[in-house]
From Swiss-Prot:
A motif (CXCC motif) lies at residues 64-67. This is Zinc chaperone Rv0106. It comes from Mycobacterium tuberculosis (strain ATCC 25618 / H37Rv). The keyword Transcription does not apply. Residues 235-351 form the CobW C-terminal domain. The lineage of its organism: Bacteria, Bacillati, Actinomycetota, Actinomycetes, Mycobacteriales. Zinc chaperone that directly transfers zinc cofactor to target proteins, thereby activating them. Zinc is transferred from the CXCC motif in the GTPase domain to the zinc binding site in target proteins in a process requiring GTP hydrolysis. GO terms for molecular function: GTP binding; hydrolase activity. Keywords: Chaperone, GTP-binding, Hydrolase, Nucleotide-binding.
């Protein structure tokens, strides 16, 4: 049986949550911190009511902080699994760490532990049981609507939105109605509780469809978890869909409306000048990025389609329209202050006109202001600042 792992993320009150979880017999808390000079790993457990702690300084792997933390954590998870007195592992994340890439690494990054351990990911021995994110609502909402940047180039909103969105349990302090309305739509699969007293109870009653470390892809449903679709004051989910492509320059101008009064935008885009590529747009607060998400099925050879997820193929069959196949745009925009009508009108105006649709031979000549996007070389692990990176654009980042 695999050992359950709980990740605790957030900006505030994570110490209280890990302290509450530590009280259960058999729980080990693991924490990594980089002080600018040394990576330190700390573990804590309770034995007959006595707190037992250890602290170790780690040797840098390849001179890289991120590699050091990743390699040590993944190996440590597998070793802790073998200990008879360990029934649960709690990973206490640094404040600006995002849980999604860590869960991905647990499931996919191959590690070599040593004699007696088969090579493979940590998921051979452990499973992500839950992600707990601590949210101080008074601070969280302004951070998640803002455009402040961290030293590593990510925006504050990218982290705070990502931490909350990926949670199975949201632990709130200073809850207020607007922030709660946003969180219910941002993380509809998560349970919400106030304070730390009921954390264990909430973890025991997670929804059956909770993430538990599973990552959405650009091709999964955008409204997974059935968020509330009715507006709650200035908070609402705006849905936009289209079966004709965007003009890249007009879309580039329109996305400015997604950077003010918007918490989160996610969506698949069909750009006229990139007929083969699914473009993925994602925003958090005042930051936005676009990246390629592979080919449309209509642009694939039969041998490529055979390897595509069955759910995506079935969805494509339902919406297939000659001559464009499964090409489409589908977006969801979580607004908190922005005018939904303005957003929909701007996106509609960015679509090709009837005259432009009649001249597909011209589409490839459209100027593309979005630039060349690529994966950061260490996209699944923290960079030198000790944080995790995602897709990053060398030319266009808003």
């Amino acid at each position: 049986m695999r050992t359950p792992v709980i990740l605790v993320a957030g900006q505030d009150h994570t110490d209280e949550v890990t302290g509450a979880l530590l009280r259960r017999t058999g729980t080990v808390v693991v924490e990594h911190r980089f002080d600018g000079h040394v990576v330190r790993r700390m573990t804590a457990t309770l034995s007959r009511g006595e707190l037992i702690t250890t602290e170790d300084a780690l040797e840098f792997a390849h001179g890289c902080v991120s590699c050091t933390i990743r390699d040590d954590l993944l190996v440590l998870l597998r070793r802790l699994h073998r200990r008879d007195n360990v029934g649960r592992i709690v990973v206490h994340l640094a404040p600006w760490l995002e849980p999604q890439p860590i869960c991905w690494a647990i499931d996919h990054v191959r590690v070599c532990v040593g004699h007696g351990y088969p090579d493979g990911p940590a998921a051979l021995d452990v499973r992500v049981a839950a992600v707990v994110t601590c949210v101080d609502c008074v601070r969280w909402l302004p951070q998640s609507l803002g455009e402040d940047e961290l030293p590593d180039g990510r925006t504050v909103a990218q982290v705070t939105v990502g931490q909350a969105e990926f949670a199975d349990l949201l632990v709130l302090t200073h809850p207020e109605p607007v922030a709660v309305a946003v969180l219910r739509r941002l993380a509809p699969r998560a349970r919400i509780t106030g304070g730390v007293d009921r954390v264990e109870l909430a973890l025991a009653h997670l929804d059956d469809n909770s993430r538990r470390g599973r990552t959405d892809t650009p091709h999964t449903p955008l409204l997974a978890g059935l968020p509330p679709l009715a507006a709650d004051g200035e908070v609402a989910i705006v849905e936009f869909s289209a079966r004709r492509p965007f003009h890249p320059q007009r879309l580039h101008a329109a996305v400015d409306l997604l950077l003010d009064g918007v918490v989160r935008t996610r969506g698949r885009l069909w750009l006229a000048n990139r007929p083969d590529q699914v473009m993925w747009l994602e925003s958090a607060g005042g930051g936005l990025r676009v990246a390629s998400a592979g080919k449309w099925l209509a642009a694939m050879a039969a041998s490529e389609v055979a390897y595509v997820d069955l759910e995506r193929r079935l969805f494509a069959d339902l919406m297939w329209v000659y001559p464009f196949g499964d090409r489409h745009t589908a977006m969801t925009v979580l607004v908190c202050g922005a005018d939904p009508t303005d957003i929909v009108n701007a996106l509609n105006a960015a679509l090709l006109s009837d005259d432009e649709m009649a001249s597909p031979q011209r589409w490839q000549s459209y100027v593309d202001p979005f630039g060349d996007w690529h994966d950061d070389p260490c996209h699944e692990m923290p960079d030198a600042a000790g944080e995790f990176s995602a897709h990053r654009n060398s030319g266009e980042s808003r």
